[in-house]
């Protein structure tokens, strides 16, 4: 009868009978192997499959309990600590269908993402192009306003020089006619007073006065405008651009006949649209311009 009962005993019953044979309670064993009494009770009730505890931990509990009770490993080696999974042959087919179902969805999402990305790139490029054109327009407007301001300032200086030149001409021309009348009345007296002391000087001065009386229209040529660079518009009109050595615009517009520009300095960059209509005097000397029907671009400098 005993062999039959031993074969029928389960591992949990063996654990319980062995513990009772040693006169040990669950609390005593729990203190020795540092396990909760509830876990030992589950093991004695053959509850080796637990959903809240992984199988590897349950197996460790059984090994520790059997080692403490000095039971052979054959008592618990055949215990199943987890449910065996059945071989599902249709699992691969179901997973394949699921993958194929979602792959088409993923392709549609990918295409939509690509379209949205292209739209974003296009909008970004359009915004950049519009801002670039706006910046270019603002830059052009700034340059044009600067050129217009310089052109508005240059005519004032040109008018001042022309007015001053017009004032100097009558002042210098007025004394020419007065000596004619004075010399007509005082010529004999001057000749008589100076004939005793300086006869040579008298003859020279008398000849000069007589030539002035005989040719009252002849007068010494006086410079109309003074400056290191003088530009005169002789006929029609011409485009004139003048810059100094620092590339600052001194004059830049179309000037008409009779206008005179004067500048002071040593280095200038000039652009003359019609060289045949312009006369340039630099440092008191006439600067020859090449008349070939083309725009003249040159620099003036003096060390």
Swiss-Prot record:
GO terms for cellular component: plasma membrane. SUPFAM superfamilies: lambda repressor-like DNA-binding domains. It holds the Pfam family RodZ_C. CDD domains: HTH_XRE (cd00093). One of its GO terms (molecular function) is DNA binding. It comes from the Bacteria. This is Uncharacterized protein HI_0367. The lineage of its organism: Bacteria, Pseudomonadati, Pseudomonadota, Gammaproteobacteria, Pasteurellales.
């Amino acid at each position: 009868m005993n062999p039959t009962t031993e074969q029928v005993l389960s591992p949990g019953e063996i654990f319980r009978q062995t513990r009772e044979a040693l006169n040990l309670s669950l609390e005593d064993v729990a203190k020795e192997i540092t396990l909760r009494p509830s876990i030992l009770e589950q093991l004695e009730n053959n509850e080796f499959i637990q959903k809240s505890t992984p199988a590897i931990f349950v197996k460790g509990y059984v090994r520790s309990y059997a080692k403490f009770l000095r039971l052979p490993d054959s008592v618990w080696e055949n215990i199943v600590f987890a449910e065996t999974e059945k071989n599902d042959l249709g699992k691969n087919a179901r997973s394949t269908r699921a993958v194929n179902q979602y792959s088409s969805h993923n392709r549609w999402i990918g295409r939509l993402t690509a379209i949205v990305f292209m739209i974003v790139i296009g909008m970004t490029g359009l915004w950049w192009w519009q801002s670039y054109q706006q910046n270019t327009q603002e830059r052009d407007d700034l340059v044009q306003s600067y050129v217009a301001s310089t052109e508005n300032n240059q005519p004032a200086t040109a008018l001042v020089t022309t007015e001053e030149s017009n004032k100097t001409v009558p002042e210098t021309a007025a004394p020419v006619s007065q000596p004619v009348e004075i010399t007509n009345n005082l010529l004999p007296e001057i000749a008589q007073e100076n004939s005793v002391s300086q006869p040579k000087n008298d003859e020279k001065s008398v000849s000069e006065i007589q030539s002035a009386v005989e040719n009252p229209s002849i007068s010494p040529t006086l410079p109309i405008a003074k400056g290191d660079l003088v530009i005169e518009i002789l006929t029609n009109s011409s485009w004139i651009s003048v810059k100094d050595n620092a590339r600052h615009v001194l004059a830049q517009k179309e000037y008409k006949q009779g206008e005179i520009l004067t500048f002071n300095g040593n280095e200038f960059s000039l652009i003359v649209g019609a060289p045949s209509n312009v006369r340039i005097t630099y440092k008191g000397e006439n600067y020859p311009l090449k008349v070939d029907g083309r725009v003249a671009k040159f620099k003036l400098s003096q060390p």
